[in-house]
Amino acid sequence: MICDKCQKQATYSRKYSGETLCSECFSNSILHKVAKTISKYKMIKNNELVCVAVSGGKDSLVLLDILNKMSKTHNFRLLVVTIDEGIPGYRDEALKIVESFCMQLKIQHKIFSYKKLFDLTLEESLELRKDQKLSSCSICGTFRRRALDHAAKSINANVIATGHNLDDVLQTFLINTLSGDTAKIGWMDPDTSSNKLRKIKPLSEIYESEIVFYAFTNNLPFQTEPCPHMDEGIRTELREFLNSLESNHSGIKNNMYSSILKISQIVKKANHKEKLNCSVCGNECTGDVCSVCKMITRLTNE
């Protein structure tokens, strides 16, 4: 195979576009696509501090690598944050990888833990739960979002950047749809430019398979061991389902993403709610009690 861009030996075949690319042109195409996504949705503005959420997995480290390269030619700053859920053995390895990579890039790195923020690790939370329908992903996701908010505010960041890729977005849409939680579909609109603390997903238009290839092509270190609790949710089944569809119908993930953008904008307008303050902790929420306080009560009082 010959690269369509530079005529060198190709290493990647992009089925949904029909392109064949060498490693360098492939990496440049990913950088260009991410930059276009950031520009299109006004994700980062001049002189802003971006709180980059880096777990140690492939997605977040690819995100950090790309944002670091972009920061050399654009006017924004980076600070890396890692959330320690308290999963023995698993998180320890990831923290070492992130710390080492941040030292290499000369970017400041801070760690925030569930234990300090909520007085519960994820493992302790799982031991407390009595309702097995309450998945580890539900507990972890609720705590993680609050932990990232806290981290970003504590460092005076303007933006929180996470490594969610195209596949993650599609899976989340299906999870919200299948669970009947349609309000959350409105949260999926990538245009968050009006929010005080913006949460952005610069990799939201990049296939997971291409993130893997980018990581290997650029020799990025990342944790390969999956979360020990990942099989509790439906996400793995949905990943396999979507990959099967894409295998038989190249580009179907891109088509689905385009539909999700339109649906999320409609739902966002229809479900607009005034922001309130939680009566327990004082954090911003849409009801009387925030999701974190509800979760802690559910775990400790059941």
What annotation goes with each model-predicted range?
Residues 31, 39, 49, 167-171, ...:
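Flexible helical/loop "lid" subdomain adjacent to adenine-nucleotide binding pockets
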